[in-house]
């Protein structure tokens, strides 16, 4: 599914960053195998750093970057540690599909806010917590359609948009808007949908100047 939603995410990220990543410093927090990181690097950002704590994922990411020639750098470091080392360094901070897997999402959001420059953009994505998301993201994706390995998600870790907005506000960020990502099992296609944040959704925040 990541390969399918990547172009949609990238389009939205570039849009939120003002229409271009050219000359911007970008960090991809919880980058995994670097699918999005690499796309961000190829989209013209000045520097693109992917950070994660999973050795295996970073190995895949580095290898792929070597093969593709994408100017992305990768590092094994916790987002909180990176924020302590490079506060206010990044124009765009991206954290996709990570918050529902960490023990303390509020801490991760605070660190993302700290990484952003004043006036910078912080873009987060996660899964809504409601009966529909349980049906689609767990029963559908993990058991019926087998898009993901069983046990990938814990429903109680899903985050409602209002909860995400509250944590971001407490971290000093201003909400710019939400964007849903919907999946059609018949056409097997994802699309951006601002009117449906029922399952997968992204949120855009600005750090005040």
Give short role names for the model-derived ranges.
Residues 33-44:
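Conserved SAM-binding loop of SAM-dependent methyltransferases across substrates and taxa
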Residues 106-118:
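A short glycine-rich, Lys/Arg-flanked "PGG" loop and its adjoining helix->strand segment in the class I
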Residues 54-56:
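Conserved SAM/SAH-binding beta-strand->alpha-helix loop
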Residues 67-81:
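Conserved SAM-binding strand-loop segment of SAM-dependent methyltransferases
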Residues 83-92:
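A short acidic, Gly/Pro-enriched loop at the edge of an enzyme's catalytic core
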Residues 146-163:
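Acceptor-substrate binding/catalytic loop of class I
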Residues 3-24, 39:
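Conserved alpha-helix/loop element of class I SAM-dependent methyltransferases that forms part
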Residues 123-145:
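Conserved class I S-adenosyl-L-methionine
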